[in-house]
UniProtKB/Swiss-Prot annotation:
SUPFAM superfamilies hit by this protein: RL5-like
GO CC terms, sorted: cytosolic large ribosomal subunit
Family membership noted in the UniProt record: Belongs to the universal ribosomal protein uL5 family.
Organism per entry: Haemophilus influenzae (strain ATCC 51907 / DSM 11121 / KW20 / Rd)
Annotated PANTHER family: 60S RIBOSOMAL PROTEIN L11-RELATED
Record-linked InterPro entries: Ribosomal_uL5, Ribosomal_uL5_bac-type, Ribosomal_uL5_C, Ribosomal_uL5_CS, Ribosomal_uL5_dom_sf, Ribosomal_uL5_N
Main function: This is one of the proteins that bind and probably mediate the attachment of the 5S RNA into the large ribosomal subunit, where it forms part of the central protuberance. In the 70S ribosome it contacts protein S13 of the 30S subunit (bridge B1b), connecting the 2 subunits; this bridge is implicated in subunit movement. Contacts the P site tRNA; the 5S rRNA and some of its associated proteins might help stabilize positioning of ribosome-bound tRNAs.
Keyword vocabulary terms for this entry: Ribonucleoprotein, Ribosomal protein, RNA-binding, rRNA-binding, tRNA-binding
Lineage: Bacteria, Pseudomonadati, Pseudomonadota, Gammaproteobacteria, Pasteurellales
Pfam families recorded: Ribosomal_L5 (PF00281), Ribosomal_L5_C (PF00673)
Name this polypeptide is given: Large ribosomal subunit protein uL5
Length: 179
């Protein structure tokens, strides 16, 4: 069991239930899934770059990524429909909690010139999205074996009904929001 999952059940649920006046514990917002996405536009010219991105994402998440393909052709970007242009992973359950714990405690503090994450990155329905400029902030990535520094998108999907509830949920886990 991940420590944050136990912490959520033991303390965060009762804290949020009192704060927002929920009648049932099932109304309390929870983290549903965490999606990691890595776009590799350069994969059009060099297929090896996509393989390296897949390997990096697999190391970070502990799960085999799905290779994403272009939905439609765009002449300006020189891509055709069906070309592999990135990879993504959806984490749920135990792996999600373990990743979330590593993200907060290990990875985010290793970001260069870190001053906190923006609280404006909520989508209006309590889901939070953030971008990471370099994958080397994760301890699973061996710095010497990295061929190219890549960024990735991290989306935390919650059952919160609005941004206020979503922010309260993440703040209860000591999520490092900018003051």
């Amino acid at each position: 069991m991940a420590k944050l999952h136990d912490y959520y059940r033991d303390q965060v649920v009762s804290e949020l239930k009192n704060k927002f006046g929920y009648k049932s514990v099932m109304q309390v917002p929870r983290i549903e899934k965490i999606t990691l996405n890595m776009g590799v536009g350069e994969a059009l010219t060099d297929k090896k770059l996509l393989d390296n991105a897949v390997a990096d994402l697999a190391a970070i998440s502990g799960q085999k990524p799905l290779v994403t393909k272009a939905r439609k052709s765009v002449a300006g970007f020189k891509i055709r429909q069906g070309y592999p242009i990135g990879c993504k992973v959806t984490l749920r359950g135990e792996r999600m909690w373990e990743f979330f714990e590593r993200l907060i405690t290990i990875a985010v503090p290793r970001i260069r010139d870190f001053r906190g994450l923006s609280a404006k990155s909520f989508d209006g329905r309590g889901n939070y999205s953030m971008g990471v400029r370099e994958q080397i902030i994760f301890p699973e990535i061996d710095y010497d074996k990295v061929d190219r520094v890549r960024g990735l998108d991290i989306t935390i999907t919650t059952t919160a009904k609005n941004d206020e509830e979503g922010q309260a949920l993440l703040a209860a886990f000591n999520f490092p929001f900018r003051k």
